[in-house]
């Protein structure tokens, strides 16, 4: 099975992540165009419940599988790899059988009582079949990740989004005549189809690239898998706890926001619309660049686990430094584009600039958010998943408490929820960094970081001037594309001028690297 280096694997995932995020963004835009702000609100209010259910079913196993498979591969232990897969499939299979019927049974209660809008029942029911699908695909993803073969992961992500986009317009159009809630359910069904296509692709890749036979002595592997089960649980339990806390917080978020806005005197329909603008429009744009940090997180777990298994601490520290540097540089241009062109992005993408104010307030804080995923991946690889879980718990409690405190104030309303969300994100990132620094030295080069922030500010001012004085075409979409391209070029030039990135580093970027140097 082809194994990539840390950098190559990361670049493959970043390329796939860029494509899938763009496709996913198109998917969100299509949904917004077909079912409107109210429909997006119903869709987004049901989504946290879906992620909570899948988190419980996955049980944190993708990270655990990745870590343990990487360690087993470093030792050349193929039998251990088989035991890991057998136990993981058994665990996720049992959990799927438990949580799928429970999800169906409690969906009406969640819709009417907790989410305060009974129309969310239909999107909740539509996503139920995805639970066992994601449970199985997560095991295969963890396996390929642990083998440091990122190609199947990358292709499956792209395939999932292609299928979603291909079906979302059809599904929403078919169900829209029956009501906005049915259209939201149709959008959810397209997501289920995408996940199924992704699973089938991963299964085919595994079947033709595997070096072990899973079905042979399957039951015997389960009986003799006590040690493997314990090792999986030592990583998966705190990882599940961390994700469960995050998803539970997200699950309660629309509930707390709805109740808080009700106290502030906002009607139910208006609250649903405002929450749709914040989470469906603004948060979608703000989290768009996180595909880079997600790719880093995916590649970091096996790379650091392998380094620790082989006791190569210098390699581990170097990987961490690489990851933090890439987070800062990629996050910087993302913040500039989101902050400066917030109104234009919203109008071009959604036909309304109502949520632009959220982006302008939240974008600067999201620079720290882009560090959160890689830092958590490092903690998990260092057997500090429990510490990551506690950090997530603290952040979730602070966020939820602040939502109630701030969103109940009529002067703030939904903006109070936005401020609470970024406060929780920043807090968790800082706690993760503090925890990692106790085990591994995080070399903070003050001059380099100061120059990086200076480049971000300078690029922001230049981008604002470009928007004000330069026109690239008659339509706003053409102007926006020109402004973003110019801003990215200026940012790259500033990085080279201040020597924050070197020419030989640019050459390593596939295809575009050599074009930039020329």
Swiss-Prot record:
* Domain of life of the source: Bacteria
Q: Which GO terms describe its biological process?
A: sporulation resulting in formation of a cellular spore
Question: Is Methyltransferase one of the keywords UniProt gives this record?
Answer: no
- Membrane-spanning parts: 6-26, 45-65, 91-111, 120-140, 165-185, 186-206, 250-270, 281-301, 326-346, 348-368, 387-407, 411-431, 446-466, 478-498
The main location class comes to membrane
The protein's UniProt keywords, in alphabetical order, are: Cell membrane, Membrane, Sporulation, Transmembrane, Transmembrane helix
Q: Which CDD domains match?
A: MATE_SpoVB_like
As recorded in Swiss-Prot or TrEMBL, the protein's gene is named spoVB
Where, subcellularly, is it found?
Answer: Cell membrane
A single GO cellular-component term on record: plasma membrane
* Pfam families attached to this UniProt entry: Polysacc_synt
Q: What is this protein called?
A: Stage V sporulation protein B
Q: Which family does it belong to?
A: Belongs to the polysaccharide synthase family.
How this chain sits in the membrane, per its record, is: Multi-pass membrane protein
Function text: Involved, directly or indirectly, in spore cortex biosynthesis. Affects only indirectly the expression of late sporulation genes.
Q: By its UniProt entry, which InterPro entries does this protein fall under? A: PG_synth_SpoVB, Poly_Biosynth_Transport, Polysacc_synth, Spore_V_B
